[in-house]
Amino acid sequence: MPHTLAQKILQAHTDEEVREAGQIVNCHLSGVLANDITGPLAIKSFRAMGAAKVFDKDRVFLVMDHFTPQKDIDSANQVMVTRKFAQEMGVTHYYEGGDCGVEHALLPEQGLVKPGDLVIGADSHTCTYGGPGSRDVAAGMALGRLWFKVPPTIRVEFEGKMPKWLRGKDLILRLIGDIGVDGALYKALEFGGETLSELDVEARLCISNM
């Protein structure tokens, strides 16, 4: 049986043979993302692990996009913890204030991720980067690898011409309405069909991140 796209990506990042959905594989990471909410939690776990340095200062991405600017002392402290960690570890890609943007869009816009990469990011709405927890991100920052459960895949074909004024967000909201918010739990959605050829990268990123 041919591998799905998700399986091919996992296979490219592991020394094990990816055979079937449900299998646990240990993969090397292309990058690790955290923000000003999940970052301090990950940093706390990172230090609790006894880690002395990040696995690659060029492949850890810290984006302060929730509290920009900081609204109070607590949010300022969140950013300060992450900023000091970035300075201590020599993290190359730290974004705050005028250099910042929405984390989900910032990485591809800056050319920090590309097709075929395996990136994890801790955020409740980081489908693009897997959406793991802060402890997983801590392990990723320290080790540069993480375990993954090979997901079953749902193939979605979008056919027909896009009506005027509709965008990628409209497509994915309709799909969610059809399958339900829990319709693809622990599954990978792979998209195809002639409609996608009309969509720009921004619209495709929107579909992937919902």
Where are these regions (language model features)?
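Fe-S-dependent hydro-lyases/dehydratases of central metabolism
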Residues: 1-210
